[in-house]
Amino acid sequence: MFWRLGCAATVLLWSASAAPADSINIDGVTRTFTVKLPKARPAPLVVVLHGNTQTGEDMISRTSWPQLARRENIGLVFPDGLNRAWADLRSNSKRALRTPPAGTDDVGFIARLVEKFVGDGSADPKRIYVTGVSNGGAMTMTMVCERADLFAAAASVIINLTDEFAAACHPSRPVPILMMNGTADPLVPYRGGRGSSRFAADGFWSTEKTLDFWRHVNGCDGQDSASVDLADSDHDDTTTVTRIESRCPRGGDVVLYRINDGGHRMPGSFSDARFPRAVDFMLGPQNHDIDGAEVIWGFFRRFP
């Protein structure tokens, strides 16, 4: 569930330069984050959550969110997980690699950030969104489960639910949600179970079962309403994209972007790796037909 797998992958992926982070105190614990706000306020605000072993700065340097935000005049906040991990609805024994300290309240941390920027007039309370990759995708789903009242829409990337996670998830209301998963992911297998990587955790649901869960939560029909193969604009990346839509009540949209033959990486208009072939070997290919941030923002901007 992680873009950086130990020291070797840290060298192979683009390394994030250190950036000054803001901080906030949560129950006596100093939590850090990086925020980028436009001059025109209140603005839409997207909470962007990093993967395991990462920090918010990785999402700034490895995705197109900053460029998109400047163009669209939206705010971004990049929180940092303690020990570079998030306390999602799974127990620590069900995770791989890093785990957050016992008792970490990441739901409270992220909610406090949203309340802070809404409270000071920086963010429009009707246009708050949350997205994340891998462990950050699991934390995104956790925020929908625990604080659906805060968000107009959500998007999870390269993550599936587990039995434990789903049993603890009881959203207070439907939240439009977009999923983006690769069929050749070695860490979070598309068909569920345990991934082929030695770093993988076990017990994942399949992407189809995870999709059905959110369809049920949002009151959607159980069958696909449309399946569209998107243009294969980059023939060299060995992957393609299929958009799968659902028939849902208004305001409860559920959409899956299936990255055919895609790995444990967010699609992007530029590479997330310094040595792409080596990272392709460890994590699978990165799709370049779509840009993950652009697709997610295109979904978000429809809500409310």
Please name every model-derived segment.
Residues 61-64, 118-120, 125-175, 186:
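Primarily recognizes the serine-hydrolase "nucleophile elbow" in alpha/beta-hydrolase
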Residues 51-55, 81-86, 134-138, 160-163, ...:
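Solvent-exposed loop/turn segments at secondary-structure junctions
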Residues 277-304:
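Catalytic active-site module of serine/aspartate enzymes centered on a nucleophile-bearing elbow/loop
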Residues 1-7:
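Bacterial N-terminal signal peptides that target proteins for export
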Residues 44-46, 175-176, 254:
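Alpha/beta-hydrolase fold active-site loops
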Residues 152-235, 245-250, 261:
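The feature captures the conserved acid-bearing segment of alpha/beta-hydrolase catalytic domains
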Residues 22-129, 139-142, 146, 191, ...:
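Serine-hydrolase catalytic machinery in alpha/beta-hydrolase-like enzymes
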Residues 10-19:
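Hydrophobic h-region of N-terminal signal peptides that target proteins for export
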